[in-house]
């Protein structure tokens, strides 16, 4: 997550479907296999409270056969609009994003987004290649701290190390997709300085890489 990301950056219009809410049901989020090998099995659920927007989110990080999945429901405002967001993000054993499914419910409409990636920098939506985010290995959903876990786990930075990466940042509620340049600096074990443009925040994470405290925003209030 990054507040106000993507301003002044080139963007690709989200391949999102926007419909009248009364005619649409929640789309099931299907599991799919991934190449690679699994690590230690995990199934961790966390509840976050956003001190900035007063939003809340319940997210589960779990092992797949050969990768990992974030599955979550968030209640939050975005641009003054109350949202209910359900999403899954599947990553491979190296924590590179492979599939993203997002479902957004608004007062009078719903929107959906589906992305796939090959784990080497190529992205697609509805079988159309997304050249504007080519080279990105991570997705960053703008309403959650969950996707900060992905580069943290993928990069495996040691204290004192810094990495600058490009990510596929998804804005809410528009679901437009923006290439965002971000930087992670490992300050100490479990502590990071996150930067993007002029924005900067201190992150505290647990042993699984899940955010415990996101400066000025999200804080974990329950976990198990």
Label every PLM stretch briefly.
Residues 11-12:
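Cysteine-centered motifs
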Residues 195-224:
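C-terminal structured interaction module
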Residues 78-126:
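Hydrophobic/aromatic-rich structural module bridging two neighboring secondary-structure elements via a short loop
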Residues 41-58, 63-64, 110-189:
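Solvent-exposed helix/loop surface patches that form functional interfaces
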Residues 44-92:
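Short N-terminal edge-element motif at the start of the domain
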Residues 20-25, 31-41:
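Short, Lys/Arg-enriched N-terminal segments with co-localized hydrophobic residues
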């Amino acid at each position: 997550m990054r507040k106000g990301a993507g301003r002044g950056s080139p963007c690709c219009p989200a391949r999102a479907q926007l419909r009248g809410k009364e005619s649409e049901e929640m789309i099931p989020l299907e599991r799919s296999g991934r190449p690679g090998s699994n690590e230690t099995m995990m199934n961790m659920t966390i509840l976050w409270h956003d001190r900035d927007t007063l939003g809340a989110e319940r997210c589960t990080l779990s092992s797949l056969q050969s990768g990992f999945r974030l599955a979550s429901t968030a209640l939050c405002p975005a641009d003054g609009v109350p949202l209910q967001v359900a999403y899954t993000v599947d990553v491979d054993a190296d924590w590179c994003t492979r599939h993203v499914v997002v479902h957004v419910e608004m007062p009078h409409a719903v929107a959906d987004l589906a992305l796939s990636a090959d784990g080497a920098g190529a992205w697609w939506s509805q079988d159309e290649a997304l050249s504007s985010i080519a080279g990105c290995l991570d997705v960053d959903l703008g309403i959650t701290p969950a996707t900060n876990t992905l580069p943290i786990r993928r990069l495996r930075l040691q204290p004192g190390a810094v990495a600058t990466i490009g990510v596929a940042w998804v804005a809410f509620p528009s679901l437009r997709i923006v290439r965002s340049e971000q930087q992670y600096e490992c300050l100490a074990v479990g502590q990071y300085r996150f930067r993007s443009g002029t924005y900067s925040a201190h992150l505290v994470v647990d042993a699984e890489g899940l955010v415990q405290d996101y400066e000025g925003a999200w804080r974990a209030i329950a976990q198990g």
